Amino acid sequence: MVSEITHKSYPLHFVLFPFMAQGHMIPMVDIARLLAQRGVKITIVTTPHNAARFKNVLSRAIESGLPISIVQVKLPSQEAGLPEGNETLDSLVSMELMIHFLKAVNMLEEPVQKLFEEMSPQPSCIISDFCLPYTSKIAKKFNIPKILFHGMCCFCLLCMHILRKNREIVENLKSDKEHFVVPYFPDRVEFTRPQVPVATYVPGDWHEITEDMVEADKTSYGVIVNTYQELEPAYANDYKEARSGKAWTIGPVSLCNKVGADKAERGNKADIDQDECLKWLNSKEEGSVLYVCLGSICNLPLSQLKELGLGLEESQRPFIWVIRGWEKNKELHEWFSESGFEERIKDRGLLIKGWAPQMLILSHHSVGGFLTHCGWNSTLEGLTAGLPLLTWPLFADQFCNEKLAVQVLKAGVSAGVDQPMKWGEEEKIGVLVDKEGVKKAVEELMGESDDAKEIRRRAKELGELAHKAVEEGGSSHSNITSLLEDIMQLAQSNN
């Protein structure tokens, strides 16, 4: 095991580059704390606004003696054609700004290079989000190994790896509705073309950016994955083999949040009083509450959100519904009051407008299920809490995560969404699951059928395995040790 003594004789210094989006930043901050707990000096490079989001959690970590520091770099917004103040993905008012955002982020190469010239001690390793391909140039210039972090599971990473090597499979499909089987996969899993996060061709600037990301992926020294061996063993083994052994599963990283305040403020300060939330949860029966959260970048149209709300109401089960605080939802809040929805569900439903203390809620004994958009952080947090999932994927890797949870792990029920909610086409796509479909899916998950009971048993089992994985001697704990030993050997051979 890498010991404190070894660190003191040859201190390791990891520089972390999180991508500026909540779903990417949250696990990277957890990774920083996990590594710092092993005596590694950590430097996090981010922008002022993003640093402010994690100020409380990181301040507590630093005050407890963890060797973590934050270096802030200004995002060159204007130079990239981005309005000032747009420092996070979830702050973009339209996805048209996404290309400008990615350009701005990757223009940080020059100021970061200057930082590295002055950094002490010299960095031993870079851990970078895959959305930041410029960090490969920094790693090459300073001869530092770069570890990639995708924020996805091994199931999805292996799927992407196979489909990139066999592009003709997706390219030869006759339509977006045609299904195909992923070859060389441990299980038989079918997708349609829009459901997989592998673009066969993207035009203009997008093509250049995605190619840069793929190239940076290929040339990275290795990969860390926020998952645990026992959750997806066949996929973890095959992906590790595809990466020539340099893939380490170190999750669930969220379990480093043991203090109540860290759980409550993970990612951002909650928009509901913690005591008020706990009081409401304490008033409900064990396992009776459905927690509903479709992520920080939910783009469902108003018509679909109404059907979701009415379906939750008709399910006659207590629920917490987290609604992202963005401009489009103003109409939804008007509907809540004008239609009488908020009044009708006030005794049974809790509406949280904005950011919720998700980890705190998921770990409460009264919560018995999680309706999720299947972002990997949420999927893993739900399973780690031992909760069965009601899956409602929107885009990106979320259909992969649904297939893993429902088909492979058998720890969830699909709401029945079969196509992505494309940005800019939400109104055209409209309602994919009506209120009857929502009510039926909730019953399948939370009801008393044999299937529902088996799904709940399976989810609970996976939750117990998650906690064992991060304990000393567990698979993820051992993999962090293995990663540090690998980087230690490299650092010593380079000097």
From Swiss-Prot:
Residues that coordinate or bind an anthocyanidin: 24, 396
InterPro entries: UDP_glucos_trans (IPR002213), UDP_glycos_trans_CS (IPR035595)
The entry's keywords: Glycosyltransferase, Transferase
Species of origin: Barbarea vulgaris
Entry annotated with the keyword Mitochondrion: no
GO terms, biological process: saponin metabolic process
Disulfide bond sites: none
Residues given in the record as UDP-alpha-D-glucose binding sites: 356, 358, 373, 376-378, 381, 397-398
Active site per UniProt: 24 (proton acceptor), 129 (charge relay)
Pfam families associated with the record: UDPGT
Family to which the UniProt record says this protein belongs: Belongs to the UDP-glycosyltransferase family.
EC nos: 2.4.1.368
GO molecular function: UDP-glucosyltransferase activity
Catalytic activity: oleanolate + UDP-alpha-D-glucose = oleanolate 3-O-beta-D-glucoside + UDP + H(+)
Keyword Transmembrane: no
Source organism phylogeny: Eukaryota, Viridiplantae, Streptophyta, Embryophyta, Tracheophyta
Known role: The monoglucosylated hederagenin 3-O-beta-D-glucoside is a feeding deterrent of the yellow-striped flea beetle (Phyllotreta nemorum).
Protein name, entry field: UDP-glycosyltransferase 73C12
